[in-house]
Amino acid sequence: MLKVSRLLHPRNQLLHKKLPGECVKGSIWQHAINTFAGFSTVRQNVVADAGKREGRVFAPYSVFKGKAALSAEPRLPTFNRLDSGGVKLNRRGVIMLTFWPSVGERKYDWEKRQLFALSATEVGSLISMGTRDSSEFFHDPSMLSSNAGQVRKSLSIKPNADGSGYFISLSVVNNNLKTNDRFTVPVTTAEFAVMRTAFSFALPHIMGWDRFTNRPSESISQSPSKVVPQLMEAEWDR
């Protein structure tokens, strides 16, 4: 496994690297939501106060294509501290997918981004897909209320006819705002393989199960709060 020093590159070094979307309006590197370092190779050097900037990792996996861009990164779970001194899962983590549209050659509008949070089960569906399989997921924040159907999100993953990759599409219908947004990002077999492998690695972490195998005492005992701050952007904030 990579050493911590290789994982925590200074942010200014990242910004000097050229990306396919380097001219992007609101580049992913400048606007990506911070992911609190939680993987076992990083956590031991993370500052206990999650409100500080030390210990955050900027590491989305991004794919820039002609009509839209897509990035994926884990959002770690949050925990409540128990009076006994242990911690209990408060909210499970997710793999957050972010889509934003193209507004010109190598230009993308970050302000019009849409989010889709993959649960652990949905991640399992994605990583188990074969070359001819397809998956579709539906999210509705008001599904069990009288407002059901006002805002709907659907994510579909379908294979190319020639087997060279997949089309990942997000549709967001907001009847309150009278909007209907759709993004489609073609990904190659190699790009999908990266996502599948990364998601498989991240799965136990977003479930919080890594706490069973790696529980450094300082990460719990020094926490000043009963609730670990939730450093994730909620899917339905948009």
Swiss-Prot record:
It comes from the Eukaryota. InterPro entries: ssDNA-bd_transcriptional_reg, Whirly. GO terms for cellular component: mitochondrion. GO terms for biological process: defense response; DNA repair; regulation of DNA-templated transcription. Keywords: DNA damage, DNA repair, DNA-binding, Mitochondrion, Transit peptide. The keyword Transmembrane does not apply. Belongs to the Whirly family. This is Single-stranded DNA-binding protein WHY2, mitochondrial. It comes from Solanum tuberosum (Potato).
